[in-house]
Amino acid sequence: MDINTKIAEELGIRKEQVSAAVKLIDEGCTIPFIARYRKEATGALSDEILRNLYDRLVYLRNLEDKKQTVLASIEEQGKLTEELRAQILAAETQVAVDDLYRPYRPKRRTRATIAKEKGLEPLANLILLQKMTVSPLEEAKNYVNPEKEVATPEEALNGAKDILAEGISDNADFRTHIRELTMKHGQLLSAAKDPDAESVYEMYYDFNEGLSKLAGHRILAINRGEKEKFLTVKIEAPTDRILSYLDRKIITNPQAFTAPVLHEALEDAYNRLIAPAIEREIRNDLFEKAEDGAIRVFGKNLEQLLMQPPIAGQVVLGWDPAFRTGCKLAVVDPTGKVLDTTVIYPTAPQNRVDEAKAVLKKLISKYHITLISLGNGTASRESEQIIVQLLKEIPEPVQYIIVNEAGASVYSASKLATEEFPQFDVGQRSAASMARRLQDPLAELVKIDPKSIGVGQYQHDMNQKLTEALDHVVEDCVNRVGVDLNTASASLLEYVSGVSKAIAKNIVVYREENGKFASRSQLLKVAKLGPKAYEQCAGFMRISDGKNPLDATGVHPESYAATKQLLETLGYTLSDVTDRNVAGISKKVRDYKKLAQDLEIGELTLRDIVKELETPARDPREDMPKPILRSDVLEIKDLTPGMVLKGTVRNVIDFGAFVDIGVHQDGLVHISQMCDRFIKHPLEVVSVGDIVEVKVLSVDVKKQRIQLTMKI
C-alpha cells in the first residue's frame, strides 16, 4: 500500500502535498509550523487538514507494521501462500488483518485443539466434504479410541463438530459478512437493571434502535449507564439471516447425511464463537466513532472558548462566590497583576450585605474598577443580586459578566497556582483566575486541564485520545495568536510550536535571571533550546519593544533578510514598521509572483509577510463575538414564553446548544429549533461564544429547565 497515495485520496488533496507534509513531519516539524511557515511545500494545507493527515499517517504506518508482523508469523509456520500474502497486504483496516490472521494465530487450548489432539480432524474433514455414504455417527465409530479419551461415537462426533465450528469461526470472509449483516440489520437493546430506580438514564430503560442509526451521544450515554450499573445492554443480531447465510456457504448438498451435523456445527460456531466476538467488536467500534464525534465537538467548543476576545485595558474585580466561607475577591490590573484581595460575607448564613457593599465601593473607588467577573458556581445568584443593587448605588460606570467557573477549583488547588500565588488561599487564587479569564481567556485557560473546562459531552468517559486531541486544539490556538515572550507563563509557552515543558520552564528561568528578551535570537541561549526548536518556535514568539521591530510580528526570522529587501524595494525602512507607517504596503505590490522571485521566496510567504507588515501582530481573536456585559439581573421566574432575549452560546452538543440568557440556568436550543433548513449538527449554525437572539418556548421553574428557539 502506498500510504501517501491513500491519504491523498482520503483527504481529497494532491499526493505531492501529502509527500511534502510527511517529509516535514518526519524531519521533526510541528503542525502549526508547517501550516504557517511551509505553505509553499504543502500547497497551503490548513492545520486541520494537517492534523487529519498526521492521524492517518500514524494509523496506516501502524497498520503496515502489523501486516509485516503477521506475514512473518504465518511464514514461520510454513503456511503463507501468495494469495494470503496478497489479501493481507491489501487489507485496509486492522480488523481485516486480524480476521485474516485468526486461523494462524497461536491459540490457547480450545475445544477444537483438544479434539485435534484426539485425532478427530480427519473425521471433521470427511464431514465437510459432504460425501459420506453412511451417517456421520456411523462413521464416528471408526474414531473411538479410549487411549485418547474418545469413549463413544457421540464423543468423536462432538469433537469433530468442535473442529468444524472453530474452522467456520476463523473464516475471514464469513466474519466480514456477518459483521456487515449485524451492523445493517442489528439492534442495540438497553433495559433497566431496576425499573424503579431514578436516574438520568430513564429514557434508556426500555430502548432499542438500529445499530446503523444510533447517534453518538446515545451510545455514550448508554455506555455510561451500563458502567454505572443502571442498564443492561446487548446487541440483537439478525440471527436467522446469518444462519441462512452460513447454511448457503457451508452446506453444498442439503440432502447429504452430513447436512444436519454441519448445521449444528455452524450454529455452534455462530452462537458460541462468532456472535460474542462480533458484538464486542461492534460495540467497541460504535464507542470509538461516538468518541471521535464527541472529541470533534469538544475540540471545536474548546477552540471557540480559547479564542474569545480579550477584554483589554480594564481593571477587573474577580468574584468567587460562596455561602459559609464568604465570597473571595481579587482586584487585577490590566496586565493581570493582582492588586488586592479580600473576603466579604453578603450571603447566608452571615448576610452582612451593607458591610460587603462598603468594601466593594471602597475597592471600586480606590482601583477604578470598571468590570466585575462573577463565577457561576454556588451562591452566584445571590452574589449577582448584590452586584446589581451596588451598581445602582454608585456613580462609576461598572458592568459585570458571569463567567464559567469550570476548572477554576482544579486550577486554584494545583501546584501551578500555588507557585503563582504562594501567599493566597485557594479562594483568592480562584477569584484572580475569574478576573484573568476575562482579560485574556487563552493565557488563563491553558493553565487548566482542557477536560475540566466544561464544554464537552461525556468527556470523563474518554481516554488518552481526548487528551491528545484537546492538547492539539490548545496548541493550534496558542500558535495562531502568538505569545509575548516577555510576559507569557510557562503554561502558555509549553504549547508554542517546538517548545517542551522543560524548555518552557527554562525560558522563564532565563527571563528571571537575565531580564527581558531584547531579540528572538536570544532564545538560542536558553538551555535545551537548540536550532531545530528555535526554527519551530521563533515565529510564534513576539517581542513588542525589542531591538528589531520584526520580532513583534509573525514574520519568521528566516525571512528577515527578504523582508528588509522588500521594505527597501517599496521605499520603507524598519523604522516605518516600528512607527506603524506601512499600512498601505499591499497597494504598492503590483506583481506578487515576480516580486517573490526577485526576493527568492515563495509567493505565499510574500503574501503572509505583506499581511504581517500591514497589521503587525494582529490578534485573530478580535474577529470573535464580544461577550455580553450586564448591569441588571433576570431570574427564571421572570421568563415567559414568547420573550425574545440575547444570549451567549456556552456549550454545543450533538442534539443542540446551551445558551446563557442571564438567568443562572442555561436554556436549551434543540437542533430542530436552530434554523428552518435541515442540519446534521448544531456546529453548522452556532459555536461556543456566539451571541444569538433566542425566543423562550417554555419554562419549568421546578426542574430549572428552559426551552429556547432561534427561529424568531
Tell what function each PLM region has.
Residues Y37-K39, L128, P238, P321, ...:
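Short, ordered loop/turn segments at secondary-structure junctions
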Residues I7, A20, C29-A44, E355:
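Feature marking long nucleic-acid-engaging regions of large polymerase/nuclease enzymes
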